[in-house]
């Protein structure tokens, strides 16, 4: 990812994989995602999916609209999850993602992708989840999560339960240190 300067998105279970300020991190996808992450998926010409079953929470209910113009490559150990009648997969590689990444780690892809990378980062900067213009007389979950993100220490762990707090935290928690972790039920 870093070697090839590839824009990346994550699912809600991958929230803590990238630091918020990582140059290649665009956002989160799905109904618990953000605009930038979803725009990146919907405008991609190639989606490389690593270890995800592409569930409804990631793709939405209209499977044929997910990555509608993209070639979709899935690398996953569980082939049965991808034999369901859901998202169109153009190429499936049935292997462990860790093994796959070890094999391709030093491969360099052809350039240029600068325009695409800039477009993705523009979406990320233009449409953050936390807008900062909430009524200060009431508690707002997005404002709370943003403040919590700013106050978390380097080795902090955040756990959210189900319901609205899960949606808001999964969507708006900012990971600012590599050792921060996020778990949900």
Name these PLM-found stretches.
Residues 1, 121-185:
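Active-site diphosphate/adenylate-binding microenvironment
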Residues 1-5, 62-67, 88-91, 172-178:
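Short, solvent-exposed amphipathic alpha-helical segments in soluble enzyme
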Residues 1-11, 46, 154-157:
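Catalytic alpha/large subunits of respiratory electron-transfer oxidoreductases
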Residues 5, 88-95, 132-139:
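Short, exposed beta-strand "edge-strand" segments with a Pro/Gly-rich flavor and a Y/T-containing core
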Residues 7-9, 49, 73, 159, ...:
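Structural detector of well-ordered beta-strand residues that form the stable sheet scaffold
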Residues 11, 94-95, 161, 185:
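Conserved beta-strand termini and adjacent loop/short-helix elements that scaffold enzyme active sites
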Residues 12, 116, 137-140:
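A diffuse structural propensity rather than consistent per-protein peaks
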Residues 14-119:
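Glycine-rich, acidic loop regions that bind phosphate or pyrophosphate groups
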